[in-house]
């Protein structure tokens, strides 16, 4: 996983959207952990932290921590939220993901409603 490339491309997207559609809000999710990709989890956490830092500096970008809800109390990836490939979410995983995104999206959007 090339962290710098991923973040650079995200920054380019943010810049392009700001230039061409300046009132457009951008929501970026943390990289989702998975058992099948534990070998890149440290890099994924780093990318997520950098996405969060970008959002802190740009009022049109909101970071949603969609990774933490998939971790157990010890910080390990939960095992019962994936289908057999240990990458894609099962029904319970998708429910967690959807609720997490909604919880991050709704408060961020409400400030633009008034």
Segments predicted by a language model, with ranges:
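Alpha-helical cap/lid subdomain in secreted, periplasmic
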Residues: 1-114
């Amino acid at each position: 996983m090339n962290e710098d490339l991923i973040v650079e491309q995200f920054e380019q997207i943010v810049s392009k959207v700001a230039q061409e559609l300046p009132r457009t809000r951008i929501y970026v999710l943390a990289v989702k952990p998975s058992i099948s990709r534990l070998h890149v989890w440290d890099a994924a956490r780093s990318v997520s932290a950098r996405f969060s830092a970008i959002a802190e500096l740009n009022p049109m970008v909101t970071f949603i921590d969609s990774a933490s809800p998939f971790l157990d109390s010890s910080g390990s990836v939960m095992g019962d939220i994936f289908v057999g490939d240990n990458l894609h979410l099962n029904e319970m995983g998708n429910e967690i993901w959807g609720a997490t995104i909604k919880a991050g999206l709704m408060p961020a959007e409400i400030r633009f409603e008034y």
